[in-house]
Amino acid sequence: MMKRFRLLSVFAVAIVAIGTLLVSCSSDDDKQEPNTITNNKGTYKITSAYIMDLTDQYSITLTAHPGNGVKATILKTDIGKRIDLSKRGRWKADSPTVVANGEVETLQSGSYVHVKSYANGQISISYCLKKSDGNGSRMEKGNYSGSIRYGTFQNP
């Protein structure tokens, strides 16, 4: 009887965890505070934003303290498009929570980067990164709308 109860308990926890991952990134900015990054450690205010021109791509870095941030690299032609990170492509995502290179791997369904606009030193971006592997399930999401500096290399 105890084995059955224990198995049911583990199964219930797994269902709740999977359900949380599936709905966590359901929409661009559902219940996400403006200009923040949220991961399994908490929610952090974005303190700076940088963009680098890499010929046919942009590398966008959003930093938040302490030690949180994200760097997304996308094609310039993808500005205004929602990029599905569960499909291969010329994109990269790098954060302390999730790292992926779209040319060699993909992220879980529901993962995306959406640079809604970039012009005149202003940017609007939202993203959700979900990955499950031998290290467990991880999720990070964020959004930022505001000024962005053209800069040199920045670690997230």
Model segments located where?
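N-terminal non-cleavable signal-anchor helices
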Residues: 11-17, 24, 116
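Bacterial N-terminal signal peptides that target proteins for export
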Residues: 1-12
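Surface-exposed helix/loop patches within compact recognition domains
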Residues: 42-120
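C-terminal or internal capping secondary-structure element at the end of a domain, subdomain, or sheet
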Residues: 116-156
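Bacterial Sec-dependent N-terminal signal peptides
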Residues: 4-5, 17-45, 150-156
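Intrinsically disordered, low-complexity serine/threonine-rich segments
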Residues: 12, 29-30, 51, 98
